[in-house]
Structure formats: C-alpha cells, structure tokens
Amino acid sequence: MLTRRTFAVALIAALAVPTLAAAQATTPSAATIERQLEAAPRVKLRPNQRVTIREFKRRPDLRRMARSIDIQSINFAFGSAAISESQYGKIENIADALQRILRRDPGARVLIEGHTDAVGSFRSNQILSEQRAASLKRTLVREFGVPGYALETVGYGEEFLLVQTQNENWRNRRVTLRRFDDFIR
C-alpha cells in the first residue's frame, strides 16, 4: 500500500525521468552549431606557432582555444559505435551546419572528438570513443554528403569527463565538434 510519502517520492522520480530524457535528447539546431563553429577565433596563432593535426589532437591547451560545440544527443547502444537511422535527424543538423560552413570557407576543418563515461576499462573506453567518432564521420560523409577531407576524428575515452564521476553519466558520453583550421600548418 502506498503511503503519502512513498507516493510523493514516486511522483517526483516519475516527473524527473522525462526531464532527464528530454535533456539527453536535445540536439542543437544547425544554426546553433554553425554559430559556435563560425564564432570569432579565441586566439590567432602566428604561422610559426601552428602545429600538425597530430599535435593538435594531443594538445588540450590548443583544443580548448578552438571554437567548439558538444553534442550529447546522439544515442549509441551500450558498448556500440553503430549509429542507427533513428539518429539521422540529429546528425542532419550537424551536416547542414558543416555544409554551410564549407560553402563559405572550403578550407574549414573540423575535428570530431569521441568521449565516453568512466564505466568500463580505460582501454575499452578509448577504443569505443575512437570508433564512435569514426562512425559519426562515416555517417556524415556517406549519408549526408559532407566532404571527408574536412573532417578528422579522435577518441579521448574517459580522459576529459564533463562530470567527474566513475559512475555512468550521459553528459560524459558525447561528441565534440572542434574547428581547428586556425591551428594547423
């Protein structure tokens, strides 16, 4: 039999679930993605300060200076890098933004960073994050016609958690799009 207290707790929990689901499902619009990646560069490197793509991927200090946006709404099955067609509507926003940017600036380059939460081994999370970033690139190129030359991928596993926890947290399972053409030789 439900007491008032039990009912109140159950009601609060039930009301919180749709909010959490809505937060997870929120996808930035193409205009928002475009605006973030087209914002004025935070820093302008001199030509002799520019680095290789490989070095850029290894330098958190440079990546933090690059224009970026976190995408937390692409849902992957647990332990999987496959992107189902049900996610294509979300990915279409990314594709539209990238295509508009590339029409204006064919030299634009975007790094797709894969991130995981801390559940599982460090190695398996590293591999999974790399596979998810590659899967998103493949989908953008094959399904939406984004030129592959404009995209690079990297996985960081659980290295850059947004929420510092060893437990499962959806905010840590994300893709970050980072504009890097201002940083490379």
Where are these predicted regions, by residue range?
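Charged, low-complexity, helix/coiled-coil-prone segments
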Residues: 25-43, 70-87, 170-175
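Short, solvent-exposed beta-strand/turn patches at coil↔beta or beta↔helix junctions
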Residues: 46-50, 54-58, 62-97, 117-123
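Extracytoplasmic
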Residues: 66-71, 86, 93, 105-107, ...
